[in-house]
A protein has these predicted regions:
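Internal glycine-rich alpha/beta core junctions
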Residues: 154, 263-265, 275
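Long, repeat-rich segments with strong aromatic
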Residues: 200, 207, 224-227, 265-268
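The feature captures the catalytic groove of carbohydrate-active enzymes
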Residues: 46, 92-114, 147-219, 246-259
Length: 275
C-alpha cells in the first residue's frame, strides 16, 4: 500500500475496501511465464481458465497501470506481441504454455482490437516513447491482418460473438450461431473499433514520426466513418445497428454502439438522441 495509489475519499469506507481488494486480486494473479511458452514477461492473469485474453488484458491494464511502480503490468501485452505470427495475426486467447487456442482463420480466433488503445492510454500517462517505438510495428501489422482477413468486399468488417467479446447478445440472423458465426453481417462495434484504432495508430505514428508508414489508414478511417454514418444509423429509433447481408439493420440495441463516442461518425443531434 505504500507504493500503490491511495485515494482520499472520506465517508466511502466500503468503496475503499473494494478498491484495495481489487489490488489484492490483481497482485494475487501475477504469473511467471512457463518454460518454453515463448512468453517474454511475467504477466497479470485474467483469472478465468489459466489462459491470457486479448480483450480482458487490455481492459484490466487500464486499471493496473496505476500500479506501475509496484509491477510493470503493461508488459502483459508483450506476451501477445511475442506470439504474433509472421503475417501479423495475434490470437485473442493464448494458453499458459504459449499455444494459440484458435486457428487464425476461425471466425472466433481474434479480436477485439483494443491493444493500441491500451498502449496509447499508457503512453499519455507515462510518456514511454521507447515502448511506443517497440509496439508500433506490431500493432500496425495486426491491424493490417484484420483488414486483409476480416473484411467484406466493400471494406467493412465482420466478426463473431467470441470475436467481439459479446457472445450473449442476440444479434445474428436466425440459423447462425451467436458465438461462432459471422452471420454475413457488418458488425457495428468492430467497424467502430477499427475506425477508432486507425486514428490512434495514426496519432502514434505522428509522435514517432512514422505516420508515413500507415498513411493509408487515414483513407480507411474516412471510408469506415462514412459507411457507418450513411448505412448503420437508423433515424427512426435514433441508434446505430449491425447490418444484415440484405442491407437491413438488426433491431437489437447493443452497448457496442457506444464505441461511436470515440469517433466523429455522428453529429451532435444524433449523439444526443443515442445517449
Amino acid at each position: 500500500r505504500q507504493i500503490l495509489p491511495s485515494p482520499i475519499w472520506d465517508g466511502h469506507g466500503k468503496e475503499m475496501e473494494m478498491y484495495w481488494r481489487a489490488w489484492e486480486i490483481a497482485v494475487g494473479n501475477i504469473r511467471k511465464p512457463q518454460s518454453g511458452s515463448g512468453f517474454v514477461s511475467s504477466y497479470l492473469d485474467t483469472a478465468y481458465n489459466g489462459n491470457i485474453f486479448m480483450w480482458d488484458s487490455s481492459f484490466i491494464l487500464m486499471f493496473a497501470r496505476y500500479g506501475t511502480r509496484f509491477f510493470p503490468f503493461q508488459r502483459t501485452l508483450d506476451n501477445f506481441y511475442a506470439k504474433q505470427h509472421p503475417d501479423g495475426f495475434i490470437c485473442r486467447e493464448i494458453k499458459a504454455d504459449g499455444a494459440d487456442c484458435f486457428e487464425r482463420y476461425d471466425p472466433v480466433s481474434t479480436g477485439p482490437n483494443l491493444m493500441p488503445w491500451c498502449e496509447m492510454v499508457y503512453y499519455h500517462q507515462f510518456g514511454d516513447m521507447e515502448r511506443l517505438h517497440k509496439v508500433f510495428p506490431v500493432l500496425c501489422s495486426y491491424y493490417k491482418w484484420l483488414r486483409l482477413n476480416r473484411t467484406w468486399r466493400n471494406g467493412t468488417y465482420w466478426s463473431s460473438g467470441w470475436g467481439t467479446g459479446m457472445d450473449n447478445m442476440p444479434r445474428v440472423p436466425n440459423g447462425y450461431s451467436p458465438i461462432y458465426s459471422h452471420g454475413h453481417m457488418v458488425w457495428l462495434d468492430t467497424n467502430l473499433q477499427q475506425l477508432f484504432i486507425a486514428n490512434l495508430l495514426l496519432e502514434m505514428g505522428f509522435y514517432l514520426e512514422r505516420w508515413q508508414e500507415i498513411e493509408e489508414f487515414e483513407d480507411e478511417a474516412k471510408m469506415l466513418g462514412k459507411y457507418i454514418h450513411d448505412n448503420l444509423w437508423d433515424e427512426k429509433t435514433g441508434f446505430l445497428y449491425d447490418q444484415y447481408a440484405d442491407g437491413t439493420l438488426c433491431k437489437t440495441k447493443g452497448i457496442g454502439a457506444y464505441w461511436a463516442l470515440f469517433t466523429n461518425v455522428l453529429d451532435t443531434i444524433q449523439l444526443n438522441r443515442m445517449i
